Amino acid sequence: MKETLDQLMQSALAEIAGAASEDALQELRVRYLGKKGELTAVMKGLGSLSPEERPRMGQMVNTVKDRLETTLEETLQRVRAAAKKERLERERLDVTLPGRTSPLGTKHPISLVIEEISDIFAGLGFQVAEGPEVELDFYNFEALNFPKDHPARDMQDTFFVDDDILLRTHTSPVQVRTMLKHAPPVRIISPGTVYRCDSDATHSPMFHQIEGFMVDKGVTFGDLKGILTNFVNQFFGAGTGVRLRPSFFPFTEPSAEVDIACVMCKGQGCRVCKQSGWLEILGAGMIDPEVYRHVGYDPESISGFAFGMGIERVAMLKYGIGDLRLFFDNDVRFLQQFR
């Protein structure tokens, strides 16, 4: 039995020394020291020895067992240390390397245009006001002199939530709300989101608009033209031609469409301006007396003007963008151009 124990120990020590992983060491532990292991089988054979041999052989078995357990544990620690070192080497990070710059976002072109227009009118004494996007019929239509049978009140043009509740079709309701809260003089611009039932390459069911108005004593149509000409020259460039054409809006009288010399051909005539040399950018006019009556102003003692423009419209002209849908596609390649 002594020779058997010596052979078993030498064989086990050799295999333990050659083990390269925790799994291999675990298999050796089970093979030699498990319930059905080889050393366990030797221990079970002690009962067949004589009483004189049994204590001596039992001590030898325990010595071999202790030696194997100690060697297994030491080898396991070395294997774990080697594996950890290899992993750390593989995952090593050179802290002296320069960091990676995170890509920075940019402002959306619509936001850029709103900020630029707001800054221009702030320099002319206008303040920014805002209002709700879900609006009452009174503020969106009735107080702005839209008759009950006006086409804009039709569901084909307006998103109605209820009979008297809708998604505002313009930012003009802010004009009414402001005049109800404040006595003249007032100078306000109101940028915001508006909604209409329309969608194609040049129209979107949701878009952005800026309404502006000024009310005071002695405000004239000449003041309106002067302020809008000033805006055009700051926004599109000095010397940009401006013209006003007669038009109609329910809440202004007289009313005008404001055109600028085509930014593509400089007024010479091209496909964009349909050879006319002019591009429409906004509507404007003197505020109708009926609007004053709805807000409690005296139309005999004050006067004022209002104007409104689509932000996407002027942004497309300023940056030469041909399709309105690009503003809403979230294409990073498009948006990164506006820095």
From Swiss-Prot:
Species for this entry: Geobacter sulfurreducens (strain ATCC 51573 / DSM 12127 / PCA)
Top-rank taxon, per record: Bacteria
GO MF term set: ATP binding; magnesium ion binding; phenylalanine-tRNA ligase activity; tRNA binding
CC cofactor: Mg(2+)
Name recorded for this polypeptide: Phenylalanine--tRNA ligase alpha subunit
CC cofactor note: Binds 2 magnesium ions per tetramer.
Keywords for this protein: Aminoacyl-tRNA synthetase, ATP-binding, Cytoplasm, Ligase, Magnesium, Metal-binding, Nucleotide-binding, Protein biosynthesis
GO cellular component annotations of the record: cytoplasm
Major localization class: cytoplasm
Pfam families assigned: Phe_tRNA-synt_N, tRNA-synt_2d
Subunit (UniProt): Tetramer of two alpha and two beta subunits.
Family: Belongs to the class-II aminoacyl-tRNA synthetase family. Phe-tRNA synthetase alpha subunit type 1 subfamily.
Entry annotated with the keyword Zinc: no
Cross-referenced NCBIfam families: pheS (TIGR00468)
Binding residue positions for Mg(2+): E253
Enzyme Commission number(s): 6.1.1.20
Compartment list: Cytoplasm
Enzymatic reactions: tRNA(Phe) + L-phenylalanine + ATP = L-phenylalanyl-tRNA(Phe) + AMP + diphosphate + H(+)
GO biological process, any: phenylalanyl-tRNA aminoacylation
SUPFAM superfamilies hit by this protein: Class II aaRS and biotin synthetases (SSF55681), tRNA-binding arm (SSF46589)
